[in-house]
Amino acid sequence: LDEYSKYILYIDKYQKKLLMWFDRLTLDVQQEYALKTVLKKPSEYVTWKLEWERKIKLFCDSSARGVYIYGTGVYGQATLELLELWGVRIAGFIESNPVAAEYKNYPICKVDDIANGLCVIVAMDYKNTLSVSEFIREKKLNVLYIWRYFLII
């Protein structure tokens, strides 16, 4: 099996119903898997990381109506921390089935209430990213998928 298949098998083997726990585990496994790559070629990693950060910053700067983060799980929280570190203020969060009205004083909007054409950072693992892709196409959102950024941070 190639490395990615081993990674997927490893994740599937330990999948639990608690989504936050699973997201945290996924992030940890991705980073552990990626760490070997980073240690082999650290200069390539630095270049890769800086390029991703440049993409994220440019995406945020391109939105006149503000940027939304799709997901309030581990990836969404990490994305918010990263953006706050850079001084970027988001417009809010998007959830498929919100359980709260806000997170850290940012509104959490239901997907059905989102206007077409918004700038959205999809902050979820690859599997969940696939599950929301149809909605993203329907709403014609300007989207940045960042699950790869969290493979190695």
Where does each model-flagged region fall?
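C-terminal "capping" alpha-helix adjacent to the active site of nucleotide-linked donor transferases
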Residues: 1
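Hydrophobic, well-ordered beta-alpha structural blocks that scaffold small-molecule cofactor pockets
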Residues: 4-153
